[in-house]
Amino acid sequence: MSSLTFPLHNFLSLAEGQQQQLSSITGSSKNVTDLIKSNGKNSSVQLENKTVNYFEKASGYLVYPSSASSVETNITSKSNNTLPAVVVIHENKGLNENIKSMANLLAKEGYVILAVDLFNGEVTTDQKRASELTQAIRDNPAGAIANLKSAVTYLSSLPNVNPDKIASLGWCFGGQQSLQLALNSEEHPLSATVIYYGRLVTEPETLSKIHWPVLGIFGDQDKSIPVESVKKFEEALNANGITNEIYVYKGVGHAFANPSSDNYAPEETQDAWEKTISFLKKYLG
């Protein structure tokens, strides 16, 4: 468990060269993987990807390291040639190219990734339509929960996946859905849950359903996810003895890790991604 922290710029774990590189990139970039730079150890990892039908009419983006690639990772099950897996959940714009790029970036760390589709193939850049799509799911959450649970079942059935090492990760609307999956995973418990500025549940009794570590990434200027709500969330996790890492970044708002957002903050995005990878390595391998 960790106390609520507010990482400052001078605590960011960026190398000098990375800082210079980040500062030279303009706001016109639409792909966060251009900005999140790994230390190079897995830059040569080759990936395989395909579109898969994992739930009713829903098709997701499956990506994983090719068998010929050498991934530097602490995978506990590498002796039987299986990898940990992550269900990646899109924001309110749908399963777009940015989410697929993030899935690729995560796969290079040694994970099998299934980026799900909760919008029946629809991708939008229109905020009004995005709000309609997400509100439809909030009004009738059962379908989305069934979709996400099927994603876990699908991953666990793959021969290259360790079914005991599956996590979920989502941003914004996807962060909320990552938490909802955690609260509805009785049949197949997860190994970790990652939430980037998603709507929270703060009732201790409800959160008691979670029996694995939780990582939360938030901004203190986020009007839709206020800091007070984050504090209550952390307190409820602690009350249940749920291992957690909660980070609230100073001076940034909602969707700060999305390069198409007006709130985009590249340095905080880099630091949050490093924390995400460290968290997943610790609890997935």
Regions found by a protein language model. Name each.
Residues M1-N10:
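N-terminal export signals
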Residues F11-L12, Q20-S38, S43, T51-S156, ...:
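Serine-hydrolase catalytic machinery in alpha/beta-hydrolase-like enzymes
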Residues M102, P226-A236:
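Short alpha-helix in the alpha/beta-hydrolase fold that links the catalytic acid
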Residues L118-E122, R199, V252:
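Short beta-to-alpha linker loops that shape the active-site pocket of alpha/beta-hydrolase fold enzymes
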Residues L148-V152, E234, I277:
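Generic structural signal for well-ordered alpha-helices
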Residues K149-K209:
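Primarily recognizes the serine-hydrolase "nucleophile elbow" in alpha/beta-hydrolase
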Residues I210, G216-F218, D222:
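Short beta-strand/loop motif that positions the catalytic acidic residue
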Residues N238-G285:
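C-terminal catalytic histidine-bearing segment of alpha/beta-hydrolase fold enzymes
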